[in-house]
Design a protein with these regions (language model features):
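Long, contiguous internal "core" modules enriched in hydrophobic/ aromatic residues
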Residues: 2-317
Length: 317
């Protein structure tokens, strides 16, 4: 273990450092302006594909011919990809929330979220550092509802309920669940005690319940990546979705077992599949193909997990 003692550099010094390492910068002032808006550290993730490698180690020096425009354009591509993905997730989130509320309220009543008996019992899990924590979806969603009830900036429909009713204490599910985060939606589906409850929600999206819950977990993970403006395009996904072997009702990829589910391509296929249900006229795939075409000279689809013949898949036609 060493001691970190690198001093902060001015934008001019940062540009000169990159030039000294072999990066071609045709317009230094433009590069400085980019660094002042984006930061060296954030952009460094987009420099890695252009760095030299020796014995499996990424070096400081750039591959000859690498330019500032390549780095910056890769950053821009990733930003546009995140926006495209986030837009699709937003549409899915609304539909998933709607189905959870609809299916469970018709089965268990308007306040099903207040019935702990429909959820699995609390679980104790051990973290990497050895600490033990209790995971209880019922307690967590009740805590969130109470926070909303006590928030003077809560949605108007929550405030209206509090002004007009004193029983039940919590608003009905179509209000309470409307203000929950995607993480809550994912956990609600996963922790429903009866498999039939999960099945009724998942069937709307043409998925088996175990696949649906797994995909929700991954969608929540990628949603957070997008929300925090983190690198997405060639990231290895830490939360890997389960494989959907085939679908009788929707167009799906022909050989799902051969696709790397830890890469973004499989996730993009997931989004496209789900969008077939909630928005059959979605232009998601057209916009994705246009984005990849525009940046084809700098983006490695291999690094994203795309098969070489992906454009021939029916799901992308």
């Amino acid at each position: 273990m060493g001691v970190y003692n690198k001093p902060p550099l001015t934008y001019t010094e940062q540009v000169e450092l990159l030039i000294s390492r072999g990066l071609l910068v045709s317009d230094k002032k433009r590069a400085e302006r980019h660094l002042s808006n984006i930061s060296y550290y954030r952009l460094s993730a987009y420099m890695r594909p252009y760095k030299q490698i020796a014995n499996g180690v990424i070096l400081d020096d750039f591959i000859p011919g690498s330019t500032w425009d390549m780095v910056y354009n890769l950053y821009v591509f990733d930003r546009k990809l995140r926006l495209l993905v986030f837009d699709a997730i937003e549409r899915l989130e609304v539909a998933i929330r709607t189905q959870i509320i609809y299916q469970l309220s018709h089965k268990y009543g308007s306040h099903w979220q207040d019935d702990k008996n429909i959820f699995n019992s609390p679980k104790t899990i051990t973290l990497r550092d050895g600490r033990k924590v209790v995971k209880d979806v019922y307690v967590d969603i009740q805590r969130h509802i109470k926070e909303q009830l006590n928030n003077n900036k809560a949605e108007e429909f929550i405030q209206h309920y509090c002004r007009k009713y004193d029983s039940p204490e919590n608003p009905p599910s179509w209000m309470s669940v409307e203000v929950m985060y995607f993480n809550h939606l994912s956990r609600i589906c996963t922790e429903l005690k009866n498999r039939s409850d999960k099945t009724e929600i998942a069937e709307y999206f043409s998925l088996p319940p175990d696949i649906f819950c797994s995909w929700l977990h991954t969608i929540n993970y990628v949603r957070n990546i997008c929300a925090h403006h983190a690198r997405l395009w060639n990231r290895g996904l830490d939360i890997t979705p389960k494989v959907l072997k085939f679908s009788r009702v929707r167009v799906w990829i022909s050989k799902p077992d051969t696709v790397k589910r830890s890469r973004i391509y499989y996730f993009l296929c997931m989004l496209n599949y789900l969008l077939q249900t909630i928005n059959p006229t979605s232009t998601f795939k057209q916009r994705l193909k246009a984005l990849l075409e525009k940046y084809s000279e700098i983006v490695s689809t291999d690094a994203m997990g795309f098969p070489h013949d992906w454009v021939n898949e029916k799901i992308w036609e």
